[in-house]
Amino acid sequence: MTTATTNPSTYPNAMAVARYVGISASKARRVIDLVRGKSVEEALDILRWAPQQASEPVAKVIASAAANAQNNEGLDPSTLVVATIHADEGPTAKRIRPRAQGRAFRIRKRTSHITVIVESRPSREGRRGGAGESAGGARARRAQGSKAAAAKKAPASSSKKAATTTEASEEAKGGSQ
């Protein structure tokens, strides 16, 4: 793996590149899309349980980038986030598979280059509200508010509904005897 330090953003960062990985770039991208923007710890957790074969080399590159950030740049591993991650196509090895009647089909063994840049971003625990707030937090508050509103309306309507269902069940019992 190749390592280097780049500075495309204002946050301190570190980089790792795995070249000639024996996975096609399209299959690696399926896994990469799962972890883009996540913290390094969360990304490694996701990849540990991902069933795809590409998750192992992607996890190795992320772990390498995190180690580079810690050892070379002196960054705190708990604040690292997968800022940039992408898979480019590498060279394709061509092989032949013999087929019936003297034919031969071509097998393309594809490789890829996986690049990861991790950044040390401040934790979000200290911040509340504002533009940096996650959509999940706002969604949870909206859901909680609607549940409270539904609870205020529910006692009256649920008692009417319960009364009608018991009357209907009594009629059904009385009519069948």
UniProtKB/Swiss-Prot annotation:
An individual GO BP term: translation
SUPFAM superfamilies: Ribosomal protein L22
Biased composition (Basic and acidic residues): 121-130
GO MF terms held by the record: rRNA binding; structural constituent of ribosome
Any Pfam family: Ribosomal_L22
InterPro entries in alphabetical order: Ribosomal_uL22, Ribosomal_uL22_bac/chlpt-type, Ribosomal_uL22_bac/org-type, Ribosomal_uL22_CS, Ribosomal_uL22_sf
Any GO CC annotation of this UniProt entry: cytosolic large ribosomal subunit
CDD domains in the cross-refs: Ribosomal_L22
Region (Disordered): 118-177
Top-level division of the source organism's lineage: Bacteria
Record field: compositional bias (Low complexity): 145-167
UniProt keyword list: Ribonucleoprotein, Ribosomal protein, RNA-binding, rRNA-binding
Gene3D superfamilies xrefs: Ribosomal protein L22/L17
Assembly and oligomerization: Part of the 50S ribosomal subunit.
Family membership: Belongs to the universal ribosomal protein uL22 family.
PANTHER family for this protein: CHLOROPLAST 50S RIBOSOMAL PROTEIN L22-RELATED (PTHR13501), LARGE RIBOSOMAL SUBUNIT PROTEIN UL22M (PTHR13501:SF8)
NCBIfam families assigned to the protein according to its UniProt record, in alphabetical order: rplV_bact
Described purpose of this protein according to its UniProt entry: This protein binds specifically to 23S rRNA; its binding is stimulated by other ribosomal proteins, e.g. L4, L17, and L20. It is important during the early stages of 50S assembly. It makes multiple contacts with different domains of the 23S rRNA in the assembled 50S subunit and ribosome. The globular domain of the protein is located near the polypeptide exit tunnel on the outside of the subunit, while an extended beta-hairpin is found that lines the wall of the exit tunnel in the center of the 70S ribosome.
Record-given protein name: Large ribosomal subunit protein uL22
The organism's taxonomic lineage, starting at the top: Bacteria, Bacillati, Actinomycetota, Actinomycetes, Mycobacteriales
Protein's gene: rplV
